[in-house]
Amino acid sequence: MLTLLLIIPLVGALMLAPMQGNTRQSESQMKRLALGTSLINFVLSIVLWGEFDSSTSEYQFTQEFNQVNFCHLHIGVDGISLYFVLLTTFITPICILSNWDNIKEQLKYFLMCFLVLETLLIAVFVVLDILLFYVFFESVLIPLFLIVGIWGGSATRVRAAFLLFLYTLFGSLFMLLAFLVIYYNVGSTDFQVVSLSEINLESQKLLWLAVFISMAIKTPLLPFHVWLPRAHAEAPLAGSVILAGLILKLATYGYMRILIQFLPDATSYFSPLVQTIAVITLIYASLATLRQTDFKALVAYSSIGHMAVVVLGLFSNTIQGIDGALLLSIAHGVVSPALFILVGGVLYDRYHTRTIRYYRGMTAYMPLFSIMFFVFTIFNAAVPLSANWAGEFLCLAGAFQRNPVFAVLGSTGIVLSAAYSIWLYNRIAFGAWSKYLNYTTDLTRREFMLLLPLLFVAVVFGIFPNIILDSIHASTSGLIYSAS
């Protein structure tokens, strides 16, 4: 079944390759083919979820195809990777729908990039080999670079694409060196073999630092955060959705799968340092969010703050913290794309400006938009009965067990998150109608149907977070106990 999840998007991309998009009918056929392919993959992932046994921490649905001297194609999922696979197949059709009407140039290649990107992301989460993990982890940059550089929103899009590409590629060179050293010492790149091997603490420290630099850039943590706001500001809407919904989650997965599982002693040693960086990043990003004038940059900085809370929970080295980090990652992967669709899609498509000061009084003329914007804004602020709140609470509870100071400082992020969320909604929704804006229509049917599944998932996982927590508990517990 995992093989099908990897192959189906590639088949869809190959079917798109010979098609010509010279007419409106042919463009519609290409979009329907890409959307249908991604929906088939989503249904298949739901079947995978239904057949998954959450009572064990072992890898399931494993398949092994060939073996060579240095790596082999071995795939499988556990409770940790399963939800990242589900998130990938859920977000991809939303990406395709989000730019359904406003990509006119090279549409075929735009759709092919997203289908190839879906395969690469799923591969990152299911491969059980550190070298293949690195290959797919870095291969994601190629379609992402094309998406931002070709279909971005302004003349500086190429610069933003290069910034994204070079920043993340530079950090990953250290990770490659670390993986080669692990292979040299252990004699294998298989996850299970590496996790059972014993590496002395001094070697672990060097390997840990090399991998951490790569993950810190992808998260991103201070001071490696510069690329993300620029990439979000220049990316097309679908690019922003996949950046917030999926690309940032690669770091979350890498922290759990590589650092905590394979280098546990070094993780314990460096945890206070990482939590300090996470708290500084959280406070800095939240304060920077209050100063933004571009609403895509504002949502981007809020994402940095939320990912800092994820890191704070992960490096508490507690079951509660890691459970909360995974739950918050999934919640952020749903809520943040919805905010980008609302401000970077609905508003920008109508008025073609991202400057917040031009917007005011939207409640009177776009009531449905205002309701949706209010719901996702308060979810982003982690109000009770939202999945963000459950995730942040568990992250802070885990941090409190290790060091109450980090938990108290991290809690300031909740206050600042509420501050910028309330300010943004009040600025856009209320007040007299702006003289800079023409009257326009409310949410279209496509926009509403695009937001509805995101709203459904955010509400269900907010009211019933145990749907996720119960099924990941065995895997996260196994992660902690095997590390200890």
Curated annotation (Swiss-Prot):
Catalytic activity: a ubiquinone + NADH + 5 H(+)(in) = a ubiquinol + NAD(+) + 4 H(+)(out)
InterPro entries membership: NADH_Q_OxRdtase_chainM/4 (IPR010227), NADH_UbQ_OxRdtase (IPR003918), ND/Mrp_TM (IPR001750)
Pfam families associated with the record: Proton_antipo_M
GO CC terms of this entry: mitochondrial inner membrane; respiratory chain complex I
Keywords: Electron transport, Membrane, Mitochondrion, Mitochondrion inner membrane, NAD, Respiratory chain, Translocase, Transmembrane, Transmembrane helix, Transport, Ubiquinone
Subcellular location: Mitochondrion inner membrane
Membrane-topology descriptor: Multi-pass membrane protein
EC nos: 7.1.1.2
Transmembrane stretches, start-end: 1-21, 33-53, 77-97, 109-129, 130-150, 162-182, 206-226, 236-256, 270-290, 295-315, 326-346, 365-385, 405-425, 448-468
Example GO BP: electron transport coupled proton transport
Primary subcellular site in the record, as a coarse category: mitochondrion
GO molecular function, one term: ubiquinone binding
Family as reported in the entry's similarity comment: Belongs to the complex I subunit 4 family.
Protein's job: Core subunit of the mitochondrial membrane respiratory chain NADH dehydrogenase (Complex I) that is believed to belong to the minimal assembly required for catalysis. Complex I functions in the transfer of electrons from NADH to the respiratory chain. The immediate electron acceptor for the enzyme is believed to be ubiquinone.
Protein name, entry field: NADH-ubiquinone oxidoreductase chain 4
Taxonomic source organism: Mycosarcoma maydis (Corn smut fungus)
